[in-house]
Amino acid sequence: DVYKRQGIYFLQKVAGAFHSIGKVSTQYVRANSFYDKNMASDTAALSMEHSKRYLLQFALQKDPIEAKRYVTACFGKSMYSDRQQDEMEKKLCVGNHKNCHLLFTRGISSEKKQTIPDEIDNKRERREILAFKKETAMQYDKNKEHFEKNMAVYQNSIRRLTESLRMHLETADETFMDASTHGRIKPARVWKALYLDNPRVFERKDEVETPGFSVDILMDASSSRKQMQQKIAAQAYVLSKSLTNCGIPVQIYSYCSIRGYTVMHIFKEYDDYGVEDELFHFVAAGNNRDGLALRAASHLMELSPKPKKLLFMFSDASPQDDQIAGEGAFYKDREYTDALAVKDTENEVQRLKNHGIDVIGIFMGSAHDSELATKIFGRSLVKIKSINEFADAVGRVLNEILT
């Protein structure tokens, strides 16, 4: 039951990272997890079976307009006009990412989650899109159920991280004495009440919390994160809630790459409040072109209302995409994977740092990939082994950067 069509694609294992094991000429591959005796016990390989209801969509060499229709039907319409989209791609989709595309979306509205646009007339594609939407809805329930089941742990993490951030912010607060209608009486001002009918004869100490920075959260939403979806959504919730509690502007989005498009799903913008539940819509699919996602994040951070910017990136340090690197003799006919992709991601992290943006990696993965994470993020890396470590580890790195 494997659908076939001509094209060049990667067949991959789902583990802590993607590992290429060959090329096949298929359009659609449904992936059924099974355990491989030759792999570590905590990793899963893939069989090419039609029975499982989630999809690994490999890139297809076809009309980019059709690809856009497909990706939009899966993830939601673009936030930008066609003209704005073209301008951004001319700016961002260059070098290693030439011939790639971007989709910035806020997702699909609830009333359209189980519908498919009429312009998708291919019956096979319609079935695949509908199956993906059903999986997305199921994953929302799983994410929320996981958070509620571990509510005590996550609420405790929010409390600890909020307290840690507030302690740091207090050292940067501006304190001044202001005239007020209540507070401690100031004898020198009493005459104003008697002769000028001015009741502001008291003195009150105002502490103005002025966090001069914003935080963006970028989440890897590729298929290699399927086993971590609930934890990623919950950790992003904890981080977002803690920052918001301290009056720090937060923007949150995920990324994955399908059919030549890197999809940036915007869950929360800087001026959105009380929308953390949107994070439970986090779902993993496709590949991850980390370098292009970082460029897209840089674009989104231009809207920050603060002079200093921080970017948290939830990553497994294993960038991979079936769209080849676009330019340069060294990269010609080379897939975006392994050393090439890691180096590209490292370069993009460094580019952001050179522009004054602090990039912090949040990593949960294998020891091998931990070395790659260190290579990409340097000292600004949070390695998480359990849920209970998250708040303290993130708080520690934040305080180091902001001190």
Place the predicted regions along the sequence by residue:
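Acidic, glycine-rich A-domain
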Residues: 133-403
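Extended non-core architectural segments that shape protein topology and connectivity
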Residues: 1-164, 168, 178-179, 380-383, ...
